[in-house]
Structure formats: C-alpha cells, structure tokens
Amino acid sequence: MKKISIKQLYREPEKFINKDIVVAGWIRTERTSKNFGFIELNDGSFFKNLQIIIDTNLDNFDKVSKLPISSSIVVEGKLVATPSAKQPFEVQASKVTVEGTSLQDYPLQKKRHSFEFLRSIAHLRPRSNTFSAVFRIRSLAAYAVHKFFQEKNFVYVHTPIITASDCEGAGEMFRVTTLDLNNIPKNDEGKIDFSQDFFDKDAKLTVSGQLSAESYALAFGNVYTFGPTFRAENSNTARHASEFWMIEPEMAFADLTDYMDVAEEMVKYIINYVLENAPEEMNFFNSFIDKDLFKRLDNVVNSEFKRITYTEAVDLLQKSGEKFQYPVEWGIDLQTEHERYITEKIFGKPVFVTDYPKDIKAFYMRLNEDNKTVAAADLLVPGVGEIIGGSQREERLDVLEERMKEFDLNEKDYWWYLELRKYGSAKHSGFGLGFERILMYMTGISNIRDVIPFPRTPGSAEF
C-alpha cells in the first residue's frame, strides 16, 4: 500500500475512513498499559498529530509499547472515525514496523524549551511544534511568492551568488577566494593581487540580485529573483542575519507608482495565501506567539496602504510632540522608532514613504527634478517598521554616471550596468523584500534566527 500523509487524512478524511492505510512518522508521545496503548504520531506534513491505537494483537507489542519519543515507525491499520473523542479519527494498528529507535536522551522532551535553547539544536528543532509550524509556513509563503509572480507573467531569473559588483555600494560583503591565506600574493603597490585569484579579480558573495535582474527586465519586461543574499554586517540584532533570502522584482516601463501597486498587491497575496492554506499553524501562532496576530494581518490585507513623501513624514513626526531617542530633522535616515510611529500612531495601517533625500539612498535610484530627492519608496508596516525598500531606477546614463562619482564607485566595475542605459534604456522600477521579514510579520516570531532553518550570524556558523 502507498503511504498516506497525515495532512491528507485531515484534509480529506472521507476518502480514508474505514479503510486500511499506511502512515509513517515519529512518535511525539506514547501512553501504554498492560494490554493496549496510544501513540501520537507526527509525519511533519501537518500541525496536528495522528492517534495510533496499539494492542496485544501486534506481534511486537512489547517493543512498540516501550519506544522512546522520536522513534520512527511505519504503521499499517484501519482509519476509524471517533466522533465522541477530541480527535476526529484514529488508526487501529494491525502492524507497526520500527524504522529507527530514538535514544532516551533525546533533547526535545515534552516540557517547553526556550527559543534560545532550540537554536543550539537547530538540526532537531523542526521536530518541535513551533518550528515545524514556522518552516511549513516558510515553504507555503515561498510557493505563494512564485505563484503571485507567475500568475502575473513575470519571468523568474536566477541571479549569481558570486559577483564583482556591490549593489548597495556599502562594501559590507563576504569575499570569495581560493588564495593561500598563509601566502597571499601582493602587487607592486603592496595590495592583494587578485589577478592570481580564481576569478582573476576580487569576487564577493552577492548582497542583492537587483542589478542583474535589471538587465533581464530590460529584455523580458517583468522579472523577479528570489534567492539567498549575504551581508557582512557585524549586527547582532533580532532583525539581522548574515545570510537571508530576498524577493526582488524588476519591471520595465514602470514608475514608482507601478512598483508600489505591485508591492501592495504582493504583500496582501502572500498573507492571504498563508492564512487560507495553513489555518492550524496560524491559529497556533495567534494563540501562543502573538495574540494580536490575526488583528494585525487583517488590518494589512483589508486596508489601502497610505502613501506620503519623506518630507511629509518628517513634518508629521516633528509636529507629533513625541520625544524620540533619535531627533527628527530633514535629511536623516528614518529609524525604526520613527517608522513605527508613522504606521502605528499616525495612520494605523501600512504606509509607503516616498522621495527620500538622495544622500541617504543608493546610487541607482532615479534623481527627482528637485535634485535633492530620489524616486524611492519604503513600505512601513505596524509592529515592525520597514519591510520593503524600492525605487524607480535611474535610466539616464549621464545622471547615473554622475551619481556613481558621488558614491566614489569605480565605473569599470559596473561597465555592463551602464551599457544597459546605452541600448534602448527605459524607465524601470523594482523593490526588495526580505523574505524572513515577512515571515516574522506573519508568524509573530520576533527573532530572524527563528524563521531561518540554519541561521548565519556574526560569530555563529554552526551546522
């Protein structure tokens, strides 16, 4: 017989009631007496467990009844409805095959464990209730991202992980090298001679797929990239990781308004998809992680996002009478406290802030007519602050070259990016959404380390 997932049983029980089935998974709990016992089985496909009834009719009852938590078994038996019990059905086992016995010192016993402890056993934490739910949500949300863009006929582009370009111009990148670190070659100036390295130049791990995606947007129209990015920032905060995933669409013949329209629609789509397809997990998060979760998500999906300029935002903050840790004046980069005040206290819903000062934004953002601001827009949401950053890209070659000089960037490193402005340049826009940021927002999980399977942070690269 073909193995059935526990999720299938819960989603379509009428197909399987009073039929012989095969299920396989890991023991969550076991209660046995002399002649019979109850096993709570979980196979990772669903939030809820499946109750297995075992009795002395099993040839190996003595062995099965003494199995430790997390032992893996394959169960054959009949699925029987149990309308008067707390679970809707159970399996009356006719055969139990023990695949792997767990040791008694299995670290995930029934008691509650702190998230900090569970991070130390990242290889086992997906077996816990919370993290099995988190990573099923991560899978569903990733599927929703692809589904959204594919339905809109965006082309999925795989941008390179190894690059010679710094998209942000910040220089906080991980270096990729095969040079002998005990005998590093030097050039005549006494600097590292990267011409002897694997790529004949200084290569890094990407901080963004945006620049590469732009080249494909100017061929396919609408594209998106969704993959890992890396930042060598020494930030030990709950919101930062050294390796994370980014959703980055780029759209040709699109301005700032077009970007904001797509971003708003995408955020609502992902949240709705997860709410509809993982109600058990989301109920768990709303009950045990963040009791205001449903209220917050409902506010996002049912509100029209507000749009204000950076100048208007600064004016509102200055007139609020609120005493902020970081004083507000035109030209500063808005801090999380400012962003949250705008979206929570002033508007009570998501807010796009547009047209930031050019000095605090990246070189590739389109310079506005005032020569002081750029056509950028960040999406701020209640409870978090900024989750999306994007802009209309600078399509004018002369302006882009001038901006690169202001940022002291070497044009030779970006020759191909500049060439895009020579051969049929067009207005285009795009944005970046940190995938983990929206996962944190949808689950109420407050630390980015708890929505990434194996988090990479300063001083930590275990597993």
Curated annotation (Swiss-Prot):
Gene Ontology MF term list: asparagine-tRNA ligase activity; ATP binding; catalytic activity, acting on a protein; nucleic acid binding; transferase activity
Enzyme Commission no: 6.1.1.22
SUPFAM superfamilies hit by this protein: Class II aaRS and biotin synthetases (SSF55681), Nucleic acid-binding proteins (SSF50249)
Enzyme class: ligase
Keyword annotations from UniProtKB, A to Z: Aminoacyl-tRNA synthetase, ATP-binding, Cytoplasm, Ligase, Nucleotide-binding, Protein biosynthesis
Keyword Kinase on entry: no
InterPro entries reported for this sequence: Aa-tRNA-synt_II, aa-tRNA-synth_II, aa-tRNA-synth_II/BPL/LPL, Asn-tRNA-ligase, Asp/Asn-tRNA-synth_IIb, NA-bd_OB-fold, NA-bd_OB_tRNA
Subcellular location: Cytoplasm
Gene3D superfamilies, sorted: Bira Bifunctional Protein, Domain 2 (3.30.930.10), Nucleic acid-binding proteins (2.40.50.140)
One GO cellular component term noted in the UniProt record for this chain: cytoplasm
One GO biological process term: asparaginyl-tRNA aminoacylation
Catalytic activities: tRNA(Asn) + L-asparagine + ATP = L-asparaginyl-tRNA(Asn) + AMP + diphosphate + H(+)
Entry similarity comment: Belongs to the class-II aminoacyl-tRNA synthetase family.
Record text on subunit structure and interactions: Homodimer.
The protein, known as: Asparagine--tRNA ligase
Species of provenance: Clostridium tetani (strain Massachusetts / E88)
